[in-house]
Amino acid sequence: MYEYANRFAALGHQVTVLHSLRRPFKKMRSPLWWKRLIFVIRGAARPAWFSLDSRVTSKIVDEFSDSFVPDGDILFSTWWQTAYALAKLSPRKGVPVNLVQDYETWTGQEDLVKSSYRLPLQHAAISNWLRVLVEKESGRSVQLLPNAIDTSRFTQTVEPALRDNFSVLALYSEESRKGTRYIISALEPLRAQYPGLHFSFFGVYPRPASLPEWVQYYQKPTNLAALYNQHAIFLSASLGEGWALPPAEAMACGCAVVCTDIGGHADYTKANETALLIPTENTTAIITALTTLFDNKAL
């Protein structure tokens, strides 16, 4: 959403990003005054990890209500809980648009998530599989607003033919739905078959103890495009995604891609043409797909 905010600001629109301390259906574990204080101390109103345009107003509010939301033309919600808050706002706040970025059921409350699609809002989805899902639940047409990548940043700088054919990169995550455990299970069998295997992970976490010593790990890499360009293959074993950015970024940087056959990869992958697609939760399939690429450099 910060990228959207920057792009809108560049077009001359007045943009405000609101971060709410309270959310519908989420119980607060600490007093409101304490949360306010912590957010101020952390400087959380503006992201430290993203270069937000100085023309964008970004602030912390107690809640998404008429008292805290400024009048405007269009208002976006980016999480199912905040969609409920949008539905209660005055028309003066703008046309409410619920931007669905994933099937957000990993914290439970699936019935409430589905019900959010039936709220009297304009609904938009970032991928075709989400568009179909929301249309089915809402009974209304849903606007497709697909994700995109910055091809001025993510571009091929090293010819694939010059890369190590046995170099593989993957995202490390401790979220079970990302499927990292299936990748880790494939590492030693692959290395036994290909002693020259060079496997790398990147992620936000400190290096996990579960990784073999021979595996390279990059924590919060500052130049992700360069990292993609250092590898011949990108691997994603996600069980579910809204519209996954890393495989698309890797493609733009010239990597061959192996990824799971899920909706979040479907908008930019075509089996055996733009990617090798594998079933979820399947270590054997990971090994087979990588073996195919290792043994067929032309692919």
Question: What is each PLM-predicted segment?
Answer:
Residues 62-72, 103-137:
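Membrane-proximal helix-turn-helix segments that form the acceptor-binding/catalytic region
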Residues 239:
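Aromatic "clamp/platform" in nucleotide-sugar-dependent glycosyltransferases that forms part
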Residues 271-272, 276-283, 291-297:
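Conserved acidic donor-binding segment of nucleotide-sugar-dependent glycosyltransferases
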Residues 256-259:
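Short hydrophobic beta-strand element within catalytic cores of glycosyltransferases
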Residues 203-225, 233:
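Nucleotide-activated donor-binding/catalytic signature segment of Leloir-type glycosyltransferases, i.e.
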Residues 124, 160-178, 184-191:
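Conserved donor-binding/catalytic core segment of Leloir-type glycosyltransferases
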Residues 105-111, 143-164, 226:
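Acidic anion/phosphate-binding donor-loop and adjacent secondary structure
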Residues 244-247, 265:
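Short glycine/serine-rich donor-binding loops of glycosyltransferases
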